[in-house]
Structures are given as C-alpha cells and as structure tokens.
Amino acid sequence: MHWLWKIPRLCTFWGTEMFHRTFHMNIKKLMPIQWGHQEVPAKFNFASDVIDHWASLEKAGKRSPGPALWWMNGSGEELKWNFRELSEISKQTANVLTGACGLQRGDRVAVVLPRVPEWWLVTLGCMRSGLVFMPGTTQMKSTDILYRLQSSKARAIVAGDEVVQEVDAVAPDCSFLKIKLLVSEKNREGWLNFKALLKDASPIHQCVETVSQESAAIYFTSGTSGPPKMAEHSHCSLGLKAKMDAGWTGLGPSDTMWTISDTGWILNILGSFLEPWVLGTCIFVHLLPKFDPQTVLKVLSSYPINTLLGAPLIYRMLLQQDLSSYKFPHLHSCFSGGETLLPETLESWKAKTGLEIREIYGQTETGITCRVSRTMKVKPGYLGTAIVPYDVQVIDEQGNVLPPGKEGDMALRVKPIRPIGMFSGYVDNPKKTQANIRGDFWLLGDRGIKDTEGYFHFMGRTDDIINSSGYRIGPSEVENALMEHPAVVETAVISSPDPIRREVVKAFVVLAPEFLSHDQDQLTKVLQEHVKSVTAPYKYPRKVEFVLDLPKTITGKIERAKLRAKEWKTSG
C-alpha cells in the first residue's frame, strides 16, 4: 500500500518547487490525503503535533513525567527534560529565533553544533517557527561552511565555539547571512548569545501551522559522488514518515534510546529525535567530543539504555575492548546504519554480548528505507525488508523489476504514487533530481539482490561494483572476508586497472598495531589466501596496499570513489 497524494497543487517531486510557492497556498482548498483508513492532515508540525501532544498528556496526568531528553557529558554534568519542559523551552527558543533574531517563516538556518541540548532546542524552535533548519557537522572547515552558506542563501547560522573562527573567516563572503547565534558561555563580537537570550525569552509561542509539504530541513549529501547537493525535506517527509514507521524500533514510553551519531548526519534526527519521540521514548545523549569506546561501554553498563543505534564502526571499536568486563542489564536491542554491517561484526557482537545487531538502510533523500525490526529474523549480510510505505525493488537498466535472486539496481517506486518520506528534491537542481529516476523508480545508488522473503542483500554502490574478467564483484563481499582476519582493522576495496582482466580487485588495508611490523609481502599473501578460503576465489584482491588510514567524508563514510579515482589516474 502507498500513501496516496491527492493534492496536485502541492510542490512536486520532479520540479522541486521552492518554499515560497508552498506556504502561500490557500490552505482551505487542501483536501486530506488518504492511505487506507488513515488520514494525512494538510497541515503538520512535529513540535506541536508530537512534542506538545506528549506534554499535554503529562500535564493531564495521563503520562509519567519521565525524561524526554537525558543529556550528559564527560565532566559528570547531567540534564533531564520531560516533554512539558522540552515544549516550554523550545517555545522560548522559537521566540529567540523570531524575536531577537528577527527570522521569518521560510528563512534557512544553518545549525552547526555538537551533541549539546541546544541542538535539539534549536531544531524544535525552527520547526515551531516555520524556519528551515540545515544541520552540519562541527568537523567542517571554512571552505565547507562557505559552500553551504552560499549555496543555501542561509539567513542565520547557529554555532558553538568549535567553528566560530571558521564561520567568521567566510561570513563576509555570504551576502544573505544576517544573524550569527552563538551557543557558548562566552560572548563574541558580531554574534548574539543564545543562552543569554533564552533566559529572557517568553515561553508563550503560537506554533506556525505548517503545510505538510512545506520545507522543514535541508541536508547536504555527503559528497561521495560529486559536490554536496541540497536535499530538501518537508514536515511531511520527516515527521509524518516517522509516525508511520517508528514501530521498527519496538520502543515505548518507558524505554530509553541512545543513537551515537554526528548531529550533521540524518541518522541523528531519525534515531535521536523523530522516531523515539513519536513513541514517547526518552532520548539519551552523551556529548562525546571524541568517541571513546570505554566510555560508551561504561554508560551502557550503568544507565537504563534499552536500545543502541550507531554505525558499524562503533560496534567494531567496542569489540576491540574486553567486553567480558561489562554487563548490559537493560540493553535489549542494537541497530546499525550508515554503512554495510559486516557479518563478522554481527557474529562477534552476538557471541560476546548475546545481542543481535539489526540493520537499517536508507539515504539522505529517503530516510529509513529498509530495516530488520525487532520482530524479524536477522540474516547476516542482509539489510532487511522495505519499510512501510516504501515499495523497494531491484530493477534492470530499463527500469523493469527483476525476480528474486537477480542482481540489479536497488530502487524505490515513486510513480504513479509518490510515497511519504521521499524528499522534495535537490534544491535549485531539478535536472539532478530527474536524472536519478529510471522509469517509475528512484535509484538508491546501490546494487543489490532481493531474496524470496523480501530481504535485500547489499552488493555495493552502483559505481563501486568491480567487473573483472566478466565476474561482477561487490566490494563489501571482499571487505567482509578481509575483516574476518585479525590483522585487518579497516579496509576499502575498489577496482584497479589491469591490462588483461581490464580491472581487478584492490584492497586498501589498515593493519592492527600488532601486525605493523610483519613482512608486508608475506602478509599480502596471507590475506589473499584468507579471502580465497572464505569466499569465491575469483573475488580475492590481486592487489593489496597497506595504509595508515582511509579517506572519509566529514560524516565518517569511506570515500571509495576518491581511492578509485586516484588509483585509475596513477595506474591506468
């Protein structure tokens, strides 16, 4: 089943009409959108329809006033807000943004903050005010910030001490930027101080009645396939989608969820904002300026955290610790997203903790697309099944759906009915949006195979597939095999030019410390034989290069494309 869009005047996916065309629509002419027996309202705002809903239940004594947000840092400071408090303080935040800052509905606000409570307040404040928030990682440098501010025409930026110098270095070149709002205990020339303004702000605020399809957020894609693009999401594609699919977590009002993710990554707003709060679940946040596996393990051991969500790398780093020293009395669910979960990681985690890691799969443009929910069986190497309301298929080069067992391009059906959860399009770039459509499908950019149970097996990024002597090889399969060897800490597999086979498999390998002194030629042979022993021999890496680290995007994804481009330039 699909959500049926019956409002032809709403901004179209293919044309990517901009915000000013959206909120000037005559609201009275909008008809409800039907899906089954449910109704999607013409207007929706997560702050009022979700946060204020739970707050009203707390006020009426119909809900326990437990924490909605539980925050801590490494210095022993802790903060807890229930939904009533969160509702009130986020209203104050909205008044800061629209009052002291003078921002107006539709203005774009860059939010570059670490995992501090103010990130959640500012995001909710933007929603309440009809502002478009644009999260960004604090790892950005001045060139990254300049690109985002200029391309988005942002009117304001909210930032902390981590990036103020980077912002000030480029702000004079951003003609649309009018407000710089600082989240800090200190003042800085040219910046308004958020904390000082918040103290004097009124808790009375009337939430803007945003149209469901009105622009709510802009996320910059990670740039693994070119310069970052601005993926625009609506209040509908973020908030309403979360109300539909949050059941995959199996959470409830008495649970606590910890998502370890950079605030600039879409996984953060999905796993540490939308999905838990829809269910009334407490969100746990640890500042963690630098990831420390021992701190994570201690927190999991001593705090009532039921559910953990993080990238596979987090689980791999935790597995490098002595897990026998820790017990997790409350933890019952572990989820992973952002990159492929290696079967070896899944098996090791289960062996050492008794817990299975369930994979979620998606992208900036679609949010969560596939998942292995708590009620589904875990199949190593598989992403799970499509999440409601998505129809995900594997298609061929003509856009035809392939039968189970056949490899093709993973794609999401968007015609004739566009599902809720789909982004509005790439801002100011309708051609790029249209170029990603094949027939009735939006290409997810990955190769995969669908089995008879509807589970998807990830083969690799579309441009990562290696074709060697007619054999099509997914890099993740080789990476999975290499990661099973104790010498390998991290690896990336790409194609490398070869005069006979056209291209062959090459592995870049980061070694474990105890293997750094080993003879590299001998170790290469050992790893090659190991791969041959655990997967089809034709997949083994004919070339191996040992490196100290791998290139990554600012959100932590390995940039295979960068490795491949350099390899083909120097060896081709």
UniProtKB/Swiss-Prot annotation:
* Protein's job: Catalyzes the activation of fatty acids by CoA to produce an acyl-CoA, the first step in fatty acid metabolism. Capable of activating medium-chain fatty acids (e.g. butyric (C4) to decanoic (C10) acids), and certain carboxylate-containing xenobiotics, e.g. benzoate.
Its cofactor is: Mg(2+); Mn(2+)
Record-listed CoA binding positions: Q139, S469, G470, Y471, R501, K532, Y540, P541, R542
Induced by what? Down-regulated in kidneys from a strain of spontaneously hypertensive rats (SHR). Down-regulated after unilateral ureteral obstruction or unilateral nephrectomy.
Transit peptide (first-last residue): 1-46
Q: In which tissues is it expressed?
A: Detected in kidney, in proximal tubules.
Give the UniProt subcellular location, in the record's own words: Mitochondrion
The record's catalysed reaction(s) read: a medium-chain fatty acid + ATP + CoA = a medium-chain fatty acyl-CoA + AMP + diphosphate; benzoate + ATP + CoA = benzoyl-CoA + AMP + diphosphate; hexanoate + ATP + CoA = hexanoyl-CoA + AMP + diphosphate; butanoate + ATP + CoA = butanoyl-CoA + AMP + diphosphate
Quaternary arrangement and interactors, per the entry? Monomer.
Pfam families in alphabetical order: AMP-binding, AMP-binding_C
UniProt keywords (A-Z) are: ATP-binding, Fatty acid metabolism, Ligase, Lipid metabolism, Magnesium, Metal-binding, Mitochondrion, Nucleotide-binding, Transit peptide
Q: Which PANTHER family match?
A: ACYL-COENZYME A SYNTHETASE, ACYL-COENZYME A SYNTHETASE ACSM2B, MITOCHONDRIAL
The entry marks the following residues as binding substrate, namely T364, R472
The organism sits in which domain of life? Eukaryota
UniProt-listed Enzyme Commission number(s): 6.2.1.2, 6.2.1.25
| Organism of this sequence | Rattus norvegicus
For this UniProt entry, what's an example GO CC term?
A: mitochondrial matrix
Q: Which GO terms describe its molecular function?
A: ATP binding; benzoate-CoA ligase activity; decanoate-CoA ligase activity; fatty acid ligase activity; fatty-acyl-CoA synthase activity; medium-chain fatty acid-CoA ligase activity; metal ion binding
Family assignment from sequence similarity = Belongs to the ATP-dependent AMP-binding enzyme family.
UniProt keyword Transport present: no
Lineage per the UniProt record: Eukaryota, Metazoa, Chordata, Craniata, Vertebrata
Q: What is this protein called?
A: Acyl-coenzyme A synthetase ACSM2, mitochondrial
Q: Which GO terms describe its biological process?
A: acyl-CoA metabolic process; fatty acid biosynthetic process; medium-chain fatty-acyl-CoA metabolic process
- UniProt binding sites for ATP: 221-229, 359-364, 446, 461, 557
The answer to whether the entry has keyword Ligase is: yes
